[in-house]
């Protein structure tokens, strides 16, 4: 599933082509996504794009009279293409722009979303989200406060959007490795020093992935059709049985809350 770096990469890629241009119309080929494509999107016509923002894993397209909320789901990606390029099997939504470009949404598994809202504040998909991990609100003191009485393993807790948004399976595994923290550790067992370190490395790992265009394991593509190159730098995720890049110990795979977790038994305590 695209996580924060992939969504932010998409935002940065599409923003220059959308802001200042006008949506001439939308072409919805298959509206049966995780939730049905909002009726307002079908009727879009002559709507200038004022901004392209991100909250958690949601892309937010600001129009004069409302917002388009886009979620990439498990396998979605957004590309900027010439208007005349024919659509393929899994290309479900196009926004046809006044500059001759098309914003094309591709999603083989159709688990994403295209929603419309007049007001962002209070919308059900955005209402109960934690802080952005790259903001000043997310720091060691905040993390320690939220972990202090939490009797659950730190790995699934990091993936809870009420704690912090956008840190999915890949980046939780990678951040815990970078901090030297075992994913089975109870959140409440983390010291102040460990919380400070973990908050810092989460920011560093996410920023590095954004620099590399995110992580492509299967479906994700940047807006120009290129893969995300952070996959080449993964330290533990997807490397079961391979030697740890630090100590040589084979990487272990386990399940936490039905999600695969990867770690090094030697480097993470």
UniProtKB/Swiss-Prot annotation:
The protein's Enzyme Commission number: 3.2.2.23, 4.2.99.18
Zinc finger (FPG-type): 235-269
Active site location: 2-3, 57, 259
Cofactor note: Binds 1 zinc ion per subunit.
GO biological process: base-excision repair
A Gene Ontology molecular function term of the record: damaged DNA binding
UniProt entry keywords in alphabetical sequence: DNA damage, DNA repair, DNA-binding, Glycosidase, Hydrolase, Lyase, Metal-binding, Multifunctional enzyme, Zinc, Zinc-finger
Cofactor(s) listed in the protein's UniProt record: Zn(2+)
Function, in words: Involved in base excision repair of DNA damaged by oxidation or by mutagenic agents. Acts as a DNA glycosylase that recognizes and removes damaged bases. Has a preference for oxidized purines, such as 7,8-dihydro-8-oxoguanine (8-oxoG). Has AP (apurinic/apyrimidinic) lyase activity and introduces nicks in the DNA strand. Cleaves the DNA backbone by beta-delta elimination to generate a single-strand break at the site of the removed base with both 3'- and 5'-phosphates.
Protein name: Formamidopyrimidine-DNA glycosylase
Keyword Metal-binding: yes
Organism annotation: Citrobacter koseri (strain ATCC BAA-895 / CDC 4225-83 / SGSC4696)
Chain sites annotated for binding DNA: 90, 109, 150
NCBIfam families the record matches: fpg, PRK01103.1
Gene coding for it: mutM
Record-annotated membrane-spanning stretches: none
């Amino acid at each position: 599933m695209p996580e924060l770096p992939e969504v932010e990469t998409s935002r940065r890629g599409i923003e220059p082509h959308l802001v200042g241009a006008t949506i001439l119309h939308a072409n919805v080929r298959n509206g049966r996504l995780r939730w049905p494509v909002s009726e307002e999107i079908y009727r879009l016509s002559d709507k200038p794009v004022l901004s392209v923002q991100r909250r958690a894993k949601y892309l937010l397209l600001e129009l004069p009279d409302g917002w388009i909320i886009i979620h990439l789901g498990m396998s979605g990606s957004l590309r900027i293409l010439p208007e005349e390029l024919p659509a393929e099997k899994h290309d479900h939504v196009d926004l046809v722009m006044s500059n001759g470009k098309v914003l094309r949404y591709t999603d083989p598994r159709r688990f994403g979303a295209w929603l419309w809202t007049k007001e962002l504040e209070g919308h059900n998909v955005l209402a109960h989200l934690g802080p952005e991990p790259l903001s000043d609100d997310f720091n060691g003191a905040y993390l320690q406060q939220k972990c202090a009485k939490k009797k659950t393993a730190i790995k699934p807790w990091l993936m809870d959007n009420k704690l912090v948004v956008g840190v999915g399976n890949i980046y939780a595994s990678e951040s815990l490795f970078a901090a030297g923290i075992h994913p089975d550790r109870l959140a409440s067992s983390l010291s102040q020093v460990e919380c400070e370190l973990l908050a810092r490395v989460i920011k560093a790992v996410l920023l590095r992935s954004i620099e590399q265009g995110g992580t492509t394991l299967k479906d994700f593509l940047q807006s120009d059709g290129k893969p995300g190159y952070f996959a080449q730098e993964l330290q533990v995720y997807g490397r079961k049985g391979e030697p740890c890049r630090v100590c040589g110990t084979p990487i272990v795979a386990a399940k936490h809350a039905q999600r695969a977790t990867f770690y090094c038994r030697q480097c993470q305590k």
